[in-house]
């Protein structure tokens, strides 16, 4: 019921996209229907080459649909000029190129270009918006730092601040966590989620980072070859099994119990007992080592940690795996 009351910031209806190669037409995506809601962080996921970049180009007005239409708040993007689109959609690309001697403050101020023109003269309102963008992304202290002298994570926050200063109702980001470490990836995605929720913006992120997307996204768009775009809450898509449409073949599956991508579990022929969390990690290590059969029962204990295998006892999983491998292939 709540979804019917949500504000639709962007909508695609019966969208077919492709390009011309020499004299032939190559269709990439067909009959797509989707809605992007204000106040939500939506993650677009799919294998390489499935058409994610093509879809983003269409949303940005860079390519025209063969069929169907894209609407921004009920207006067709084909009726909006470049300047108007720039005021409505803020974009952060994967590897933007900016002069290394440009400061963070100068970069963020560029976000006001669609509103000031290329003269770049900021009035008091523009300056307030730039300051707010720096504050909202918690990088005010970096205002005078050069882009070449800050970390990748800080640079990505500066790019997001520039997009905030642009003040579009839609924000589109292409792999914003690429090249970042684990903590920074979480931090950037949490920042984008907060921006969507607190500022009522519709935020669309193209990503391959499934684990972090599950933790932060309000909605997923799933794309795969030959199938319609699937939209839904990550949790609904996991429970229904639709999340597995992202996975090739049957080698991998998404574990509903553990909330992560795993190799398809092989037929394991051994008995293991002990505290649940210790059993899980011990079993995982044995499976990863390619060992499918252990003749004696395994007992895992903690405080202190130990693993018993018949009369043998080990104080680490590493020791157990080493021993099991010797039993399988004693020559080594």
Give the location of each predicted region:
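The feature captures the beta-strand-to-loop junction immediately N-terminal to the Walker
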Residues: 45-47
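Helix-to-loop junction immediately C-terminal to a conserved catalytic motif
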Residues: 60
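Conserved ABC transporter NBD signature motif
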Residues: 68-76
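Conserved ABC ATPase "signature" region
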Residues: 124-142
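Conserved ABC ATPase signature
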Residues: 146-150, 154
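Catalytic Walker B motif of ABC-type/P-loop ATPase nucleotide-binding domains
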Residues: 171-175
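ABC ATPase nucleotide-binding domains
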Residues: 249-331
